[in-house]
Amino acid sequence: MKIQLIAVGTKMPDWVEKGYQEYARRFPKEMQLELLEINAGKRGKNADIKRILKKEGELTLAAIPKGNKIVTLEVTGQAWTTEQLADEMGKWQLDARNISLLIGGPEGLAPECITKSEQRWSLSALTLPHPLVRVIVAESLYRAFTLTINHPYHRE
């Protein structure tokens, strides 16, 4: 199974790339984690945020391979413990589809992305910076994966 993290925004700080790669490289070939970055619209003093969000949504949806299960990351989604995430990942594997996890930009995800999602996941009720979310998601997925294979990474 491949988990494709589709995230709005490019040119992330070096620590974001290093943090994400630290966990992505730990996955085995049968459970790959891949990052696809979507160009964020240019924001300025007089930017039309609705238009920018719509364009980001179109680019995000166009990047999703046909047949992938779409999971959005948003504050109104379902909060999972590590054990629950491991269970969800097990269900994803049984579904025999690849996963596209969508992360929005500074204003979140376009409504069209949320409408198309089959599942909604909330990392926290807190507002998190979208670059940090990449690292948290990669680590959370890796931690949950290690539970499914009885690897000692996760401690209770």
Swiss-Prot record:
**One GO CC annotation:** cytoplasm
Where S-adenosyl-L-methionine binds, per the record, is at: 73, 104, 123-128
Q: Where are the transmembrane segments?
A: none
Q: List the disulfide bonds.
A: none
Enzyme Commission code(s) on record: 2.1.1.177
User: Which EC class is this protein assigned?
Assistant: transferase
Q: Which residues form a coiled coil?
A: none
Keywords on record: Cytoplasm, Methyltransferase, rRNA processing, S-adenosyl-L-methionine, Transferase
One Pfam annotation reads SPOUT_MTase
State its location(s).
Cytoplasm
Q: Single GO molecular-function term?
A: rRNA (pseudouridine-N3-)-methyltransferase activity
Give yes or no: UniProt keyword Protein transport. no
User: Is rRNA processing included in the keywords of this UniProt record?
Assistant: yes
Q: What catalytic reaction does the record list?
A: pseudouridine(1915) in 23S rRNA + S-adenosyl-L-methionine = N(3)-methylpseudouridine(1915) in 23S rRNA + S-adenosyl-L-homocysteine + H(+)
Q: How does it assemble?
A: Homodimer.
What is the purpose of this protein? Specifically methylates the pseudouridine at position 1915 (m3Psi1915) in 23S rRNA.
Q: Which family does it belong to?
A: Belongs to the RNA methyltransferase RlmH family.
What name has this protein been given in UniProt? Ribosomal RNA large subunit methyltransferase H
Species source reads Psychromonas ingrahamii (strain DSM 17664 / CCUG 51855 / 37)
